[in-house]
């Protein structure tokens, strides 16, 4: 409804939204290669291909953006950094910024499985891929248990001179917060067409 309203009001252009859940064999398991498989490529390559195959009015040359919330915020920031050439911009809400924080937002942590030989911190992935990093924004609620980690990511990016947008708003780690701030993501994407 949010995107449809913003399109109808002329605030953003028409677009196709594909919103997968990462839940392969557990929360966060779709954001990395592991067990000898490139599971991270399914969001980067297969979701856009599936949208095209489903008849969405998009082509291989259509702009593609990545966004997420909570664990999906980790996915958006990390995949967006690692595969910067695939995305026009990145947006994230209430993000896990380090896989070792996963216990704060999921019931069954897979940290020991997910952290084998991979970068586990968003900051390290952004630093490693800073030359190809798309325009990036992220936000967090003032009552969110991940606020400190999001502030730290913001401070570290500022210290490293990496351009980004960071905002804080009232609210916590909850759907009402994310629903309110989806508009910020869509407007940010519209600015980067």
What positions do the PLM features span?
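Non-catalytic cap/lid and distal C-terminal segments of serine-dependent acyl enzymes
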Residues: 1-193
